[in-house]
């Protein structure tokens, strides 16, 4: 269709973005001129819509030209056969010419490569030829008035001559031709006015009779034009609505696709692709299994680097929260860049400890060289910073080459990690190293092939673990200062005297923020930012772009459509083939081959059904006026007309009430179909009643007659006369009475075509049985079979239109439904990715980044005044961990650790522990915190006791969980817990692989509470005891304990919970008996047997012993 709503889609689907005030005002001024010829204000969007409707418009044009060709051909054939008729007019001999013209346009239109401009030109030519055809059908009498005898060459021109041809052409131009709405309306008005004017001036007749006939003709023209305008406007509005709905779904789909790409990139930045995709699939569709799935891979030839910033603790303690996060992000952001340059993968950041692996995701033969280069670059970076600020900062680096197991453990807050004895040794190498030196083992040295100068490292003199295992170490000797980072003008920033920590910290932050030196990215900024401006514009929310989905307003201007969305739709339209889409429909019934889709299609509400009934009521009123003007009065017809009008009024009232009351399902497809059929039959019965009253039923057997016609043998034959002079108008009313079928859009074409067949058959039977064709139609028309040709052509046009509308609506729905399904799929993917994202970051942190503007994104950090921090370690897990061929070099040991951590994670799924946030796992150490949800300071102070109580209960229940695992797995693991409370800083650092963490003295002390604690006990600080002493817990004072960096600290053991009377109801201790509680998650893992005696912890283990490389030292790095 051509004309279209301006900036919206009728009744729904949304319009677009409102323009400025000036453009809106201009649109309002033009509204009066363009109300019936609506289109999108955006030319690009309008062109898309034209392309969207091209094939359907081409099919409609073919149908229109076929009907017009049949019409002109039938009239030409009648002329060729020399059928008697009225006096010769201007149309004499023009019908064959018009038939040829319409057929020529039909051939041109059938060209597959026809484009929108060519189709519009074909439609305009067809309309022009239709206009000349209609004008020539007007009653222009060239032969003068009749000589009083029907036997003359022709009778006088009549007022009814050419009316049915004009009615048919007018309807076809509205319903099927691809011309603008204003052009179609103008055509209809010109045709009607021309016929009325010619009739009034050229047709000889008695004035009273002529004016009544002109009035009846005018009413019929009004009815056809009214129906045509309704069909044209609402058909196009519904199509534009479907187009905008599909576009909205595609827009949402693209927006969701971009969001999913961001989330996918985030996921890929945190985990290797192969691990991430496998975990994602299992996370969304958890397989049924007894054990939790472990995501561990083995790599036999890699190099591991551990690095620690020496002197960072004192500097960080003087920083504000924002400065600390900036410090960490700038430093580790630079380290991430260096890691990428040197083909290393950063694994984790632990306080100020940074470790990475080379040769992990992509095997490399020079992985040892890469790690050495990485270590030297890190030292150069810190050296540059130290020289610029005169702060005593340095880097201690340790390397080892060997085997690792990499992957993730647990069910929540996944973090990629590596485990093995070789990882532990690399960590020990860092601890035993010296500032400014790269400390390597003999194994790594052998992989360097003599490419670096080395010197003895004497690591065994500084570390007992190296001495015990007789490990020889070396230092890399750099030949010269390898990298001087530009952007540091030392003379401008070196102070004359030593600066205070606060000044140094501020200067360091500003210095590292210099883009020339450190191009550290904001975490998530590379993930959350789109690639180009067009893409960003296309990602605006649908509520901003499509504001009027429930109403079709012509004054809404679509000013700034998403260019990217339009380009995507354009590509879809290029690939779209209507024939391929028709494959989803049954060719004869046009039903969807998928039953479910057919059912959903029938559930759509017909928003124009009430309007169609109102229009039918108006048509009934027009029939009443025509009846009163020219038909003889009949009680039966009058009663039928009154009943028809009353029934239609009742239908309108019923539909209005149900719409106001919002009765669900009150107008199903079955009810709509039955009402449509009954209404059409009823309105048609009124016209058929007029026909019956005007036909010669009572005189068909009488010999007396005043009418003389020529028989086929050339003899004059006397035939009976008709009982009224308005037979032709009765037949015209029958033709117009079938038009209501065209305005019930949501009624399927099959029942319409069946009904049309019945009405046409009854029409022909009435004419044949009445003797009308044998009388030759009396004085009305000399062409006895012309009414039959008229009803057949009308029925053909209505059937083709019904099928075209049905195809159009079904294909529109199919395209919109497919777009909606894709959008829903992407929405599901988005929700799934968001679930995974919330499993990687705390919910409030993830939401912060999802809602942030990528252009203005800043570092995320948050200061908390009171947070409970817990470290829970299994110190004797290192005795269990062993690397043998029989356990796949330690994989089976990690499988059991995964079960333990997963069961701890499952505890957090309880609603009681919803405030606890898992931070990470460090080897066999589990770190969690409570009170990190953003709250006001007052609320935080009031709730800290309850928060700590929740954390304490969680720690107590962790002992129960570990006891059950011990019972089921023949082990005797022992838990050791430390809890502290105080201020912390939370934030996200690391641009390439963002990581959420918490820092502060509170975290360090909580780690020391674990490392200095006693196995099987929960050690807490004095502050925790003070906050929980009024709660139902039993505490035992341990006394003062020496804590690194803090001196002597008074600590307490939390022994368990007590009831209201002080009786201990839940205790902790090494001597307690382990009792199976029968948790469902652990049943069936192992047959219940008596646990083995506890394994004692070996004395003299280093801070990072085999199997758990970071429970105490690295975990307790001061932030």
Swiss-Prot record:
Predominant cellular place of this UniProt entry's protein: membrane
Tissue: Detected in zona glomerulosa and zona fasciculata in the adrenal gland (at protein level). Brain, retina and adrenal medulla.
Keywords recorded for this protein, A-Z: ATP-binding, Biological rhythms, Calmodulin-binding, cAMP biosynthesis, Cell membrane, Cytoplasm, Deafness, Glycoprotein, Lyase, Magnesium, Manganese, Membrane, Metal-binding, Non-syndromic deafness, Nucleotide-binding, Phosphoprotein, Repeat, Transmembrane, Transmembrane helix
Phosphoserine: residues carrying this PTM: 551
Residues annotated to bind ATP: 308-313, 350-352, 396, 920, 997-999, 1004-1008, 1044
Quaternary structure and partners: Interacts with CALM.
Protein name, UniProt field: Adenylate cyclase type 1
Species, as recorded: Homo sapiens (Human)
